[in-house]
Amino acid sequence: VTLMDGSGLSVQDAVPAMLLADLLSAAAAPDESQRRTTALRPMLVGLPVAGSSGTLAERYDGPAAGGRGWVRAKTGTLTGVNSLAGTVLDAEGRVLVFALLSNGPNPVSVRPRLDALAAALRSCGCH
């Protein structure tokens, strides 16, 4: 983790996707006897729902429609950066966590692809 400023606006700031996924995984862990799980669990409730609330209300059409109502995620958009990190319930009822980050000249064009990737996790049958 590299934090050059307190706002997250510096191009030198860097937070690895794995850190975001690890935080989400700890929050979603089934064992609530873990103190960190109990402390982080409220974070999941506040995540926007695909096609329904917050920054995801107008998203998840077309190829990503399968994620509507299933994907819960926080979006992040800055100049040249687009991210989506959250949870999705897969076809077998497991909670999966994900953190997708893109860095390029046109983050808006990447947004539907991030949505489609998160929605694809819904149909995952990992057994």
Predicted regions and their residues:
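Small-residue-rich helix-loop
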Residues: 1-127
